Amino acid sequence: MDERALVFSDGLTDPQISQVLALAEAATRHDGVAPLSEQALLTLRAGRSRSLLSLEDGVIAGYAHLDPAPDGAGASGEVVVHPGRRRRGHGRALLRALRERARGPLRVWAHGDLAPAAALAAAEGMARVRVLLQMRRPLQDSPLPEVTVPDGVTIRTFEPGRDETAWLRVNGRAFADHPEQGAWTLEDLRARQAEPWFDPAGLFLAERDGRLIGFHWTKVHPDPIGEVYVVGVDPSAQGLGLGRVLTLIGLHHLRDRGLPAVMLYVDESNRPALRLYESLGFTRYAVDVMYQSPPPH
């Protein structure tokens, strides 16, 4: 008879981190979609993840990441089970353990909107509350509109050591209602700057009268494919069409690097952003879903 155990940790050991990363890679190969977000992977690799492990005969069969989310929106989590150890109750056990530790409403991301995840969420009484779309467009075989920068606005690239504070200010204002992006700290920003993909030449800043009012941060994946990583416009600069301008500047940059295509993520409920991206030739490619449970009784 196999031995099962659930283990909670505020920081996994290096061997445990390696096992979880291998588990996530196996799930990606099997499902065709990565089971963990960038933020979850960053905290995992840094040894700072609040983690739940589901063990079977001493082997990590499943992993859950818990983000206590001090923004008041409730805790959030992500769950992955090794493909070879599914349908044995690991996912359900991890989900219920997350709910207990959340001590309030729990939000859980299901990357890829896969049927087994939807079935588990329904069985656990969780409601579908948010849909994140991945959209894509080709770059080399599809023309891009030219860029016209508004009068009084200048564009330059990010300078590490100079622009962090201003960037965080605009990011916080632009995403004040966004539970993940708007709460970024200097530590979060520096964690991305330390990643091998970070390139300040791909982070474009818009300024007016010497003050930052918007940005477009691009990213290049090894596939290779480019990404509209994040576009933010300060509320004081709304109405200038700056979101479209910054998006196009980044798309031209990625095209000129020779990348065949570009991707982005956008909330399905963000109708203005969806209209913008569709007008620029993006189409829907994949879906992530957030489920929410009520607090435990």
UniProtKB/Swiss-Prot annotation:
What Pfam families does its record include? Acetyltransf_1
Recall the GO molecular function terms of this protein's record.
mycothiol synthase activity
Q: Which residues bind acetyl-CoA 1?
A: 79-81
- Could you tell me which residue ranges the N-acetyltransferase domain spans? 7-156, 153-297
- The EC code for this enzyme is 2.3.1.189
Coiled coil among keywords: no
Q: Which residues bind 1D-myo-inositol 2-(L-cysteinylamino)-2-deoxy-alpha-D-glucopyranoside?
A: 38, 180, 219, 227, 265
Q: What InterPro entries has UniProt attached to this entry?
A: Acyl_CoA_acyltransferase (IPR016181), Bact_Acetyltransf (IPR050832), GNAT_dom (IPR000182), Mycothiol_AcTrfase (IPR017813)
Superkingdom of the organism of origin = Bacteria
Example GO biological process term? mycothiol biosynthetic process
Which PROSITE patterns has this protein been placed in? GNAT (PS51186)
Q: Which reaction does it catalyse?
A: 1D-myo-inositol 2-(L-cysteinylamino)-2-deoxy-alpha-D-glucopyranoside + acetyl-CoA = mycothiol + CoA + H(+)
Key words, A-Z: Acyltransferase, Repeat, Transferase
Q: Which residues bind acetyl-CoA 2?
A: 231-233, 238-244, 270-275
Record-linked SUPFAM superfamilies: Acyl-CoA N-acyltransferases (Nat)
How it assembles, according to the record, is: Monomer.
Q: What does this protein do?
A: Catalyzes the transfer of acetyl from acetyl-CoA to desacetylmycothiol (Cys-GlcN-Ins) to form mycothiol.
Per the record, the similarity remark reads: Belongs to the acetyltransferase family. MshD subfamily.
**What is this protein identified as?**
Mycothiol acetyltransferase
Q: Which organism is it from?
A: Thermomonospora curvata (strain ATCC 19995 / DSM 43183 / JCM 3096 / KCTC 9072 / NBRC 15933 / NCIMB 10081 / Henssen B9)
Lineage at the top is:
Bacteria, Bacillati, Actinomycetota, Actinomycetes, Streptosporangiales
